[in-house]
Amino acid sequence: MLFRKPLKATQDNIDEGFLQIQAVSDNNQIPVADATIEIANTGEPNKPLEQITTDADGITERISLDAPPVEFSMEPTDNQPYSEYNLKISAPGYEDTIISGVQILSGEVGLQNIRMTPAAGSERLYNPIVIGGHTLWEFYPPKIAEAEIKPMDERGEIVLSRVVIPEYIVVHDGTPTDTSALDYYVPFQEYIKNVASCEIYATWSESTITANVLAILSFTLNRVYTEWYRGKGYDFTITSSTAFDHKWIYQKTIYENISQIVDSIFTNYLSRPNVTQPILTQYCDGKRVTCPNWMSQWGSKYLGDQGYTPIEIIRNYYGDDMYINEAEIISGIPASWPGYDLSIGSTGQKVSMIQEQLNRIAQNYPSIPTVLIDGNYGESTKSAVEQFQRIFNLPVTGIVDYPTWYKISQIYVGVSRIAELI
């Protein structure tokens, strides 16, 4: 038995979930090959259940781990809906990393990214990374209500004239006034994926997850657009406190289906007529805390089960005048998506650019085959795209669609920037 954490479930009441791990170097984001990962139940951390190794791309195979029945995440109960595991990661030339509290849900693929610190040559004290409980299971402070539309500042202007998707979010890991809390620079999409994985269950319907991701996106982009905390004298974008913003946990396990939804809609936010700024869409769990005129997370789950679309769920809580908008500017991206997919038979400059970017990425991720930069989308380009999609947890289609275009751009910018610094 892998699932040994004492939950209110019998041994006959056990499902399975999945885990895949990707290890990168903390100082340059280069994949860490041949890292060894020991997996243990949190209740018995010194009794490894599995041992797996990363490949040349820093990625492990997907493994099956025991998880509580899926029903535990379908309605509020006294049964913890996820199992928890500890990871110990070791690799030549790097300090050991320990992560405690990796959460596995029934039927879902957990993606655990691990940032490994190069060995400094001197012995260090272990400081395990502890992943806190999910917001729908643990008790966190309820959101302090705010106006959903922020007033202009005293100078009569808001710093940004248009809604921009930032390259990074600066997350203050505590309350705004906690000067001991650390600030983290987090890529925008990774931040949204982390928050969604903290706030809702990946076992919920696609429609419900999409509605909640839209609310998280809009809330976050309101903080970016209004420069809410910077206007108060702070040097960060948002906090990890549920009393002020949403939950974000350093090194949190994210889930593949949530990741793919975020990649598909990360430029969207929620608007009202004649209001430029993204709406500060606040929400609560809807069970322990109720919040009239805000979205109920559990309520949105039940609406999704009934077949409501994401915008129908949104309007059920925020009103019929709410609509989905899209940011025109994405920071840090070489070129915007052309508006159409690239696939077998496509030709031209956009194809050449993708080929060039894939070849650069392949220098860091060697399983991606290099291709001839000729502007013709043939079988070799399709194969390179498919391998890229496998590595970065996108649907493997061999087609450069909207999510794949921006993921290639993001990774290309990352590896190119790192090369400039070396």
Q: Where are each of the predicted segments found?
A:
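Short, surface-exposed beta-strand/beta-hairpin micro-motifs centered on an aromatic residue
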Residues: 55-79
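Beta-strand-rich domain onsets/edges
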Residues: 1-32, 44, 52
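Exposed beta-strand and adjacent loop surfaces of beta-rich binding modules
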Residues: 18-20, 34-36, 84-86
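Conserved, single-site charged/polar hotspot
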Residues: 2-3, 12, 34, 38, ...
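Solvent-exposed strand-loop boundary residues in beta-sheet-rich modules
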Residues: 27, 41-45, 93-95
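A short, solvent-exposed loop/turn motif at the edges and junctions
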Residues: 70-100
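Contiguous segments within soluble domain cores/interaction surfaces
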Residues: 43, 49, 70-73
